[in-house]
Amino acid sequence: TICYSHTTTSRAILKDCGENSCYRKSRRHPPKMVLGRGCGCPPGDDYLEVKCCTSPDKCNY
């Protein structure tokens, strides 16, 4: 699966992930900003919302 991959300080690159999922991590509370994207599906918490997806490629736009 091809996923977008970046943190708040790096620009987005396309990464070929071994696992079949991508994630997009964002703040749950205003200002709602995207904090990162990458491979896999890490758990969210009270402050972070993590949206995971498995297809198609670049699904974590």
Swiss-Prot record:
The entry's keywords: Disulfide bond, Secreted, Toxin
The keyword Disulfide bond is assigned to this record: yes
Pfam families on file: Toxin_cobra-type
Taxonomy, superkingdom: Eukaryota
Molecular function GO terms recorded: toxin activity
Subcellular location: Secreted
GO annotations of cellular component type: extracellular region
Tissue: Expressed by the venom gland.
InterPro entries cross-referenced by the UniProt entry: Snake_3FTx (IPR003571), Snake_toxin-like_sf (IPR045860), Snake_toxin_con_site (IPR018354), Toxin_cobra-type (IPR054131)
Disulfide bonds: C3-C22, C17-C39, C41-C52, C53-C59
Function: Inhibits acetylcholinesterase.
Recorded family membership: Belongs to the three-finger toxin family. Short-chain subfamily. Acn-esterase inhibitor sub-subfamily.
Name of protein: Acetylcholinesterase toxin C
Phylogenetic lineage: Eukaryota, Metazoa, Chordata, Craniata, Vertebrata
